[in-house]
Amino acid sequence: MKEVLKRGMLKFENSFFSHVVRCALGMIIPLVLTGGISCAVRDFPVAPYQMFLTQGGGRWFYDFLTMVYEGTYGIFSVALVITIAYSYAMEKNESLENVVMYVVVALAAFSAQLNLGTEDFDVAGLGTTGCFAAMFIGYLSCMAFSKLRRCHKLMLEQYTAGMGGGCVLAIRTLIPLGIVAAGSGGVNLLIGRITGIYGCYQWFNHIFYAACQNIADYSNFLSGLLYTFAVNLMWFFGLHGSHILEAVAVHNFGVTGNVVFSKAFYDVYVAMGGCGTTVSVLIALLLFFRKERTGKLAGLASFTVVFNLNEMLTFGIPIILNPILLVPFVLTPVVCYCLAYAATVCGFLPVLTHEVVWSTPVGIGGYLASGSWKGIAVQAVGILAGILFYLPFLKINQRMEVYKAKRHVQVLIHELQEKEEQIDQPVFLTRGDHIGMISRMLLLDLKHAIKNKELYMLYQPQVYSDGICIGAEALLRWNHPVYGMICLLYTSDAADDLIGV
């Protein structure tokens, strides 16, 4: 049973979709962190500081931080479409020219459902609110474009024979691109005429808004539970759940002082460290995995997690699309939600009556929300419960990580050996798929190993049958801290690339 689960998890993690989405989301981490940090600095909850920014001489700095935030989060969906298309094409090992065409097609398909030039256009669709549509349409448009390119009748090859220049590929892909863009716009128009709602991201918001509204009328606890579960489940699949459901939260979960659950309640007592209550992950890694790769990553991510920006952890470990960590990632916030809700219902915590900015650090947020140490205590209990919940899964993930790493290197070495047998020059570093990514990662590790003198020589004596030693064979060895002994073939091949670096 254990082997079946292991194979199933590996199959999911190594799937084409998983590689594309994880790579695409990883590439926009700088965008997210830049915008998130600017927001955290702008909204840091200290009254004199806020007075200085909004009413004193620091107004220019406030405007600057706002521009940075809007300039990053405001184009989040556009950036995601580009990285999805790029990752899709690179995973297909396409040429640079084809990669560009994939990006153009995805942007055209995404733009076709934004209702540009009509009164239904909403600039929010370009930002984090539209990231579900960006991922969904970006991936499907690339898939459709890839299939249409296989139809030679659509590629206009007879019209480009003998033609030179960069426009050849553009002409050949004219019809496939037009079909994909027109198809996206047509579906948007058709569903809009039927439902009266135009725009993919607006369809999703409307459905979830209606569901939350119906449940909220019946039970504030259940509607909050649904919201908590849905947000973190979306995050697991790489969708920025809190941003996708922002409109739902504004309409259904505002701070009124009459009900327990609100968006501010979720930010303070549930989303500690970000989605999945990842402050618990951070502490667990720092306490129990200090010497491992994930422990070192946690040290690097500490500053951003303090402000509830956890992308370095969720994509670095990774947690996103990692089936091993699905259960604690989704259910730890549910546990924290139930603890905080119970503490409020029984009177230990007061009902939240004012907004608390989502980027407020843990501890400060608990104090501001409750006005006393009680909010901090509830946060601490939730974090401790999260550590205990996450810990066994993190240990399993660590073992699986070592297993996967060695397996990936075995695949790389196997391909390298095949190239050697065929007397063919291996070209791994320029490949766009996961083999290329592993090769480039190992090349960086080899640079570090050479710099720190971690490579060494072993000498194997050559002895005649009569016991006389006639010489020795020198063997270059590299003991990688994760992958173990690296094949001499790769070490020498990568060294050739290092000479040219």
Residue ranges of each PLM-predicted region?
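Early transmembrane hairpin of solute transport permeases
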Residues: L10-L156, I320, F329, V334
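Active-site core of bacterial EAL-family cyclic-dinucleotide phosphodiesterase domains
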Residues: P426-L488
